[in-house]
Amino acid sequence: MRLPALAFALALLLPAAPALGGDELVGHAEARALLGKPNVRFVWADSEKEFTKAHLPGSVVAYAHDLHLLDDVKACQGLPMCEQRAAGLIGGELGIDAATEVVVYDLGAGANASGTWFFLKLFGVRSVRILDGGLATWKAHGGPLEAGQPAKVAAKAFTPAVDRTMIATVDQVKKATGDPAHYLILDARQTLDEYSGKALQTALASTDKEITVKRGGAIPGAVFSPWTRYAGNKDGQADKPTLRDPPELQKQLEKLKKNGYAPDKTVISYCHVGLGRGSFQYLALKRAGHQDVRVYVGSWDEWGNDPSLPLAALP
């Protein structure tokens, strides 16, 4: 469902979403106490192949990269999915409604968990937390496991309540490239090969069509800021925190001042599909206390596939 043009324009003028309150993570002990409760849903954010090997009992699957559909991004003003499709996924397939408490987890590194977390928060799921340390920490502490296919859950009614202060559209990013006094664009991709354009990635155009990005490179003015700088557990090891502590995250922001960071700027984070490394950087900056952070969900999948959009001049 498309927003009317006026409503969309007003959405861009809304105040930024507040900084996170510190409850975006849940420890393994608290998560274990939630197993089996009727209004709790555990959601796996990595690939289904990994899921079938071992997962928390009763889990469903919402692989972060599959939540970004380029055709929907273009059709629905920057959303990773159009609202009707997202409602069907969240309520119909995942069995989540307004009263559901959701715990998202991945193997342990946290990037994909952040993508699914971001997707659910964006569409209005109120109670969503990430399992700190992911499956690796859960296993290390003897948490129960099962293998095989996702749980079959009853469909629930879910009405999206989109928070557009969480995202930036391609038009807003284009504006940001020419307004460094008010915007900072951060490229959260992990390698310089992606940033420079040597590496080209694939993503979903629609639910049944995968494409390879046509052009490599970066958005003009974007600062290389890999998500691993903010990660406490980039290798997915047991008993390591998903995110660095707020003081450590704030030090990373201090380092970015030489690249134009300022607390009053709108920071736009992107990666290849937005839901993953870009959303992890969003989560980290919010945890560090930055107010106006947005994910460009279209990310390089949209920008790199549009020949009318400029590329950064890189050495």
Locate predicted features.
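Cytosolic catalytic domains that perform sulfur/thiol-centered chemistry
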Residues: 19-315
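Bacterial N-terminal signal peptides
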Residues: 5-16
